[in-house]
Design a protein with these regions (language model features):
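Subset of outer-membrane beta-barrel
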Residues: 1-213
């Protein structure tokens, strides 16, 4: 399969030229740009037997912020699912080879001058690296009657880019678990609930406590 994805924000005001050479604010100098991430994916999957299926995607990433910043990157994702009766297990490995995004900046002299005047660092051409991430998941479906069932699921995101503010934080691995349930009525009504985004945040006294969503 071939897929194209775009995630972006349009009509962002560019105020780097808001003030003219005489120091006057001129709103007519405001222009607008879009910031978007685009992905071109070539995917393949197949069923190895009645229980096991595998697949993968090769992706080309293009990132763009107006006319002054562009990036190209490449990466590979792999996955596998195993199903046995009411149990399902899944593994997704994202950015297996690490995904490299090569950034190039094209700034006008006015933009560069604005960066200096506002005390901001000039962006430099470079490589943005997305390290591998593994997602493990398991689910179990409980059938009560012909038209009623309850599905439980647990997922864990395992990142490899160092300590994160998650339940299990380590170096270089951090683990972020998620729990969820879905109550199914006649395949028409679905009631869902879940727990995730477990983090340490300060309370009113400044003490760190765990919070969940």
């Amino acid at each position: 399969a071939f897929s194209f994805l775009r995630f972006g924000v349009d009509n962002i005001p560019n105020t780097t030229e808001l003030i003219d050479a005489q120091g006057n604010v001129n709103y007519d100098r405001i222009s607008y740009f879009s910031a978007a991430d685009m992905g071109f994916l070539l995917s393949y999957g197949r069923k190895l037997n009645e229980n096991l299926a595998v697949g993968g995607s090769a992706k080309i990433i293009h990132r763009k912020a107006g006319d002054f910043a562009t990036a190209w990157g490449f990466g590979i994702d792999l996955s596998a699912t195993y199903q046995k009766e009411d149990w399902k297990l899944a593994l997704v490995a994202k950015d297996v080879t690490s995904t490299f995004n090569i950034w190039n900046y094209h700034l006008t002299d006015e933009m560069i001058n604005t960066f200096y005047l506002t005390g901001n660092d000039l962006p430099q051409n470079g490589i943005e690296l997305s390290l591998p991430r593994v997602i493990l998941g398991a689910s179990r479906n409980f059938k009560f009657k012909k038209d009623l069932s309850l599905l439980f699921e647990i997922n864990t995101d395992i990142t490899t880019d160092g300590r994160r503010n998650v339940l299990i934080s380590g170096e270089p691995f951090s683990i972020d678990p998620h729990l969820g349930a879905e109550f199914n009525i006649k395949n028409i009504v679905f009631i869902r609930s879940g727990i995730g985004n477990i983090q340490k945040t300060p309370d009113l006294t400044g003490k760190l406590i765990y919070t969940v969503q």
